[in-house]
Amino acid sequence: MIYFIFNKIKVFYRFFKIDTLLLVFIMLLSGLGLLILYSSSGGSFDLVYRQLIHLGLATSVMLVVAQIPPLLLMRSAPILMLLGIILLILVLLFGSYGGGAQRWLNLGFIKFQPSEMMKIIVPIAIASILSERTLPPRALPVIISLVGIAIVVLLIAKQPDLGTALLIGASGIYVLFFSGFRIRLVKNPWLNLGLIAGILVSLLYAAWNYLLISYQKNRILTLFNPESDPLGSGYHILQSKIAIGSGGLTGKGITNGSQSRLDFVPEQSTDFIFSVLAEEMGFIGFILLLSIYTLIIYRCFNLSLRCEDNFSRLLGASLTFVLFTYIFVNMGMVSGLLPVVGVPLPLISYGGSSLMTLMASFGIIMSIHKHKSPRYLQ
């Protein structure tokens, strides 16, 4: 029996040629996510079964994407970016509402969120633009990249979904960062730093006064003093912090968390699922979660840096840093260190669209490692 299973695994590996170590880490984290999801739903298997279906579909997407050569992604980048922008415009014109925002596009046979696609499309497009010539890039490709990022960010912010807009914008900026791009407005380094700081302050001022709407401003202000509105805008943060703090070293045990079982923790199966983990598994559970995340991030960076072409290195490194950003933002959000922006915890939170996007990202990283041989880059 063991020999039969081993042979099947060997055939599977030879056919797909994926990175086994990364897959093992992903499955470990997914298993932990299912356990916490079971607990957050009050010991019900309903959400667990549905998440298992999502995981199966998302894993299939990862395996398919892992077979796509990076060269095909690079050549398809302009079409993908144009298609993504068109879909974002269609969302603003004909999109359906959900959760107070116009984010979904309903085609009758399928309902999806185009902004989820842009989490992958933007890094692919920017990496394609910047990798056409030697690095660090010259001014023209950088300007084109910034314009493309700005268009996508503004269209998503208009839905409104500022959290997703900023994170997608960051995914494009990460590609610029890894390309070695440096902002040099003037020769004097101190004057250059002052000008950059002035531009950033001006952008923040403009965003606060002309881009952010009232509830988004309230979320930011609540961050500094959640006790000022404990039953309103500060409720999420306060209940989450109580749950995290009450977990102690070893936690209260699976399905034994008082904050989660009594429904004090909001969105405990999605955005605030980390609060459930911290309350029921304590500091040890947090270290376990952080350790698996660290292994995944290290492995993804390791696979990306082994690549022999600029496009693959830029794309792999930026997608890995996007994963880190989502982890950091979610944990910071539920801990009261960052505003509540509705970001799921990767491979732990319940959800289908975000999971598909994440697994597709893993598929891309596996693909650039699989096709790192020079013969794929011609």
Identify the residue ranges that each predicted region occupies:
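Hydrophobic alpha-helical transmembrane segments of multi-pass inner membrane proteins, especially
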Residues: 23-31, 35-233, 275-335, 360, ...
